[in-house]
UniProtKB/Swiss-Prot annotation:
Short sequence motif named Effector region, residue ranges: 32-40
Protein name, entry field: Cell division control protein 42 homolog
Gene Ontology biological process terms from the UniProt entry: actin filament organization; bipolar cell growth; cell division; endocytosis; establishment of cell polarity; mitotic nuclear membrane biogenesis; positive regulation of mating projection assembly; regulation of beta-glucan biosynthetic process
Residues anchoring lipid (S-geranylgeranyl cysteine): C189
Compartments it resides in: Cell membrane
InterPro entries for this protein: Cdc42 (IPR037874), P-loop_NTPase (IPR027417), Small_GTP-bd (IPR005225), Small_GTPase (IPR001806), Small_GTPase_Rho (IPR003578)
Membrane topology: Lipid-anchor
Main subcellular location: membrane
Length: 192
């Protein structure tokens, strides 16, 4: 059975593990335990053909910056995650995560994933962010970032409610099986 390797990266506590556990077990985990490295496998049908979707969870904490890339070889698609309630994690997609995966795996398709969308309209979250002169990130901001970085696309979900969750992995599978062709600048011949 063919395998698709999907690696999930992003800051600590943005919901990477919850995303994977909720998708693979249909249950939302109740406790937060920082991940060092974990993997999960599910069988998915694509047309009439079964595939193994290998899901690799990684640690977002800086302590693991040297260890994390060991999970990158042979990756078919990356999910680069941020929480829509954490502007710092959104900035780190551009400053840290996208450059890191492109350094180690140039040309591998990446999706930008906004997590915890169930908290976007939560009054206590909005108040906490407002005290810091911030607000939850919008879908449009995610799409703009994906375009700016050259990601395959922007998707968002809630591991708690499962809204958009299956779509994240459906889009990852599509990107892995049919990676976009990188746009090469057309070279022009100039005769002077």
């Amino acid at each position: 059975m063919p395998t698709i390797k999907c690696v999930v990266v992003g800051d600590g506590a943005v919901g990477k593990t919850c995303l994977l556990i909720s998708y693979t077990t249909n249950k939302f985990p109740s406790d937060y335990v920082p991940t060092v490295f974990d993997n999960y496998a599910v069988t998915v049908m694509i047309g009439d053909e079964p595939y193994t979707l290998g899901l690799f969870d990684t640690a977002g904490q800086e302590d693991y910056d040297r260890l994390r890339p060991l999970s990158y070889p042979q990756t078919d698609v990356f999910l680069v995650c941020f929480s829509v309630t954490s502007p710092a994690s959104f900035e780190n997609v551009k400053e840290k995560w996208f450059p890191e995966v492109h350094h180690h795996c140039p040309g591998v398709p990446c999706l930008i994933v906004g997590t915890q969308i169930d908290l976007r309209d939560d009054p206590s979250v909005q108040q906490k962010l407002a005290r810091q002169h911030q607000h939850p990130l919008t879908h449009e901001q995610g799409e703009r970032l994906a375009r700016e970085l050259g990601a395959v696309k922007y998707v968002e979900c809630s591991a708690l409610t499962q809204k958009g969750l299956k779509n994240v992995f459906d889009e990852a599978i599509v990107a892995a099986l049919d990676p976009p062709v990188p746009h090469k600048k057309k070279s022009k011949c100039l005769v002077l």
